[in-house]
């Protein structure tokens, strides 16, 4: 039984380290498939919105890649973990409300409990996609190891996850990335 959103034809759960290119990949897919076919859902959206409300912060600034967001990241992670411990599906339910496109790209899946929730709610139409990039590539995109962030469950929760359905290598080779995206797009179109 699908909760509150439409019934998707395909749910792709994207995960990866900070600065691996998850947003870049999901936005590239959406631009090729069209926003009428494909919705990008961000688990961090409702988390940041609720956190901003409870702490009197600027929600929009928490959503961008700014130093403002980074200043609150550690506390936001702790707060989000407390919410998830009380209700593992809390943020998952929030992001699917009212979504009507047939393809859902969840751009920031970070925990096994997120994957389990989508698999239980949507079954066989759920696929996992891991975006990987070398540390060097991530550093070129501005990543710097931050204790309490890069070693927290929000970054490491899927490091030992069983097999991902798809692995996208995003090390900076545009042609190789393009080939992988085309293969994934073919699969997505076969499910529509």
Swiss-Prot record:
Pathway info: Isoprenoid biosynthesis; isopentenyl diphosphate biosynthesis via mevalonate pathway; isopentenyl diphosphate from (R)-mevalonate: step 2/3
Binding site for ATP: 17-23, 141, 171, 180
Entry function: Catalyzes the reversible ATP-dependent phosphorylation of mevalonate 5-phosphate to produce mevalonate diphosphate and ADP, a key step in the mevalonic acid mediated biosynthesis of isopentenyl diphosphate and other polyisoprenoid metabolites.
Species per Swiss-Prot/TrEMBL record: Bos taurus
Compartment(s): Cytoplasm, Cytosol
Protein name per UniProt: Phosphomevalonate kinase
Gene3D superfamilies attached to this UniProt entry: P-loop containing nucleotide triphosphate hydrolases
PANTHER family reported in the protein's UniProt record: PHOSPHOMEVALONATE KINASE
Cellular component terms (Gene Ontology): cytosol
Entry EC number(s): 2.7.4.2
Gene Ontology biological process: cholesterol biosynthetic process; isopentenyl diphosphate biosynthetic process, mevalonate pathway
Presence of keyword Nuclease: no
Record's keyword terms, sorted: ATP-binding, Cholesterol biosynthesis, Cholesterol metabolism, Cytoplasm, Kinase, Lipid biosynthesis, Lipid metabolism, Nucleotide-binding, Steroid biosynthesis, Steroid metabolism, Sterol biosynthesis, Sterol metabolism, Transferase
Enzyme class: transferase
Phylogenetic lineage: Eukaryota, Metazoa, Chordata, Craniata, Vertebrata
List of residues binding substrate: 170
Pfam families documented for this protein: P-mevalo_kinase (PF04275)
Any GO molecular function: phosphomevalonate kinase activity
NCBIfam families on file: Pmev_kin_anim
Domain of life: Eukaryota
Assembly, per entry: Monomer.
């Amino acid at each position: 039984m699908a909760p509150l959103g439409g019934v998707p034809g395909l749910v792709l759960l994207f995960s990866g380290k900070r600065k691996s290119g998850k947003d870049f990949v999901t936005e590239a897919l959406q631009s090729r498939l069209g926003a009428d076919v494909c919705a990008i859902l961000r688990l961090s959206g409702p988390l940041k919105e609720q956190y901003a409300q409870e702490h009197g912060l600027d929600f929009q600034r928490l959503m961008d890649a700014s130093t403002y967001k980074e200043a609150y990241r550690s506390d936001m992670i702790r707060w989000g973990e407390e919410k998830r411990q009380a209700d593992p599906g809390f943020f998952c339910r929030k992001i699917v409300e009212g979504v009507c496109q047939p393809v859902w790209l969840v751009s920031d899946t970070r925990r096994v409990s997120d994957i389990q929730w989508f698999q239980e709610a949507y079954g066989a139409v759920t696929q996992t996609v891991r975006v990987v990039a070398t540390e060097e590539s991530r550093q070129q995109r501005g990543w710097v190891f931050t204790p309490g962030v890069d070693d927290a469950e929000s970054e490491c929760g899927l490091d030992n996850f069983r097999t991902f359905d798809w692995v996208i290598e995003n090390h900076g080779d545009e042609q190789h990335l393009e080939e992988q995206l085309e293969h994934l797009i073919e699969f997505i179109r076969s499910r529509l």
